[in-house]
Amino acid sequence: MLIGSHVSPQDPLAAAQAEGAEVVQIFLGNPQSWKAPRPREDAAQLKAAALPIYVHAPYLINLASANNKVRIPSRKILQQTCDAAADIGAAAVIVHGGHVADDNDLDEGFQRWRKALDQLQTDVPVYLENTAGGEHAMARHFDTIARLWDVIGDTGIGFCLDTCHAWAAGEQLVHGVDRIKAVTGRIDLVHCNDSRDAAGSGRDRHANLGAGQIDPELLVAAVRAADAPIICETAEEGRKDDIAFLREKLNS
């Protein structure tokens, strides 16, 4: 089971070595911008590296939106991100589920997701990540994810489970792993994060493992059940300890 972290995109290989990471995740551009990722001078080096590199797509992406000024740029930047991810030999691109205006629009949101995936041209796998909060979200509650998966599951899309997000959404972590696997067939990646807030808060505020509200042993049980590569999206100070903690627990 590979264990690593979300690191600065400046030199991910050096960051991985410094943190003892066996796998990393990076942004390829500003996560709060619609601008396409710039070509990387080290693309060939990253592509040749043995280290698996995952790419997190910009937060602005909302493939479910009925608003053309949001949905169309979302499709464009996802395509550009996947193209840039292919250039570095990325293992996958992770994208949030987005949301619609009201619950009456959920089914239309699922169809917009389907259309976006049908139009996407890439050999890089794309993983949907569950989200912490937001009204009328595509991927906050597991029941809604199941409905979305009925529409998009046969496109080859994968799934990334974020423990902080599931906690914030009020989902049970270990039982939730079984529920998600029953829907998607597998979990492809885990974002193992503690939460600064109470269960069901809807707040997406990560904490280093053991420094938040989630029992560390519960996190260990969840990631063990998920049986997928692990990325710690926690504060840089303490992240090396997060990796070491998980490695000790999961290898014991």
Curated annotation (Swiss-Prot):
One example GO MF annotation: zinc ion binding
UniProt EC number: 3.1.21.2
Broadest EC class assigned to this enzyme: hydrolase
CDD domains registered for this protein in UniProt: AP2Ec
Residues engaged in binding Zn(2+) 3: 165, 204, 206
Free-text comment on the cofactor: Binds 3 Zn(2+) ions.
Binding residues annotated for Zn(2+) 2, in chain numbering: 129, 162, 191, 233
Keyword DNA damage attributed: yes
Stretches of the chain forming a coiled coil according to its record: none
Biological process annotations from GO: base-excision repair
Entry-linked SMART domains: AP2Ec
Pfam families for this protein: AP_endonuc_2
Amino-acid positions noted as binding Zn(2+) 1 in the UniProt annotation, renumbered to this chain: 56, 96, 129
Record's keyword terms, sorted: DNA damage, DNA repair, Endonuclease, Hydrolase, Metal-binding, Nuclease, Zinc
DNA repair recorded as keyword: yes
PROSITE patterns with a match to the protein in the record: AP_NUCLEASE_F2_1 (PS00729), AP_NUCLEASE_F2_2 (PS00730), AP_NUCLEASE_F2_3 (PS00731), AP_NUCLEASE_F2_4 (PS51432)
Catalytic activities: Endonucleolytic cleavage to 5'-phosphooligonucleotide end-products
Top-level taxon of origin: Bacteria
Family indicated by similarity: Belongs to the AP endonuclease 2 family.
Primary role: Endonuclease IV plays a role in DNA repair. It cleaves phosphodiester bonds at apurinic or apyrimidinic (AP) sites, generating a 3'-hydroxyl group and a 5'-terminal sugar phosphate.
Stated name of the protein: Probable endonuclease 4
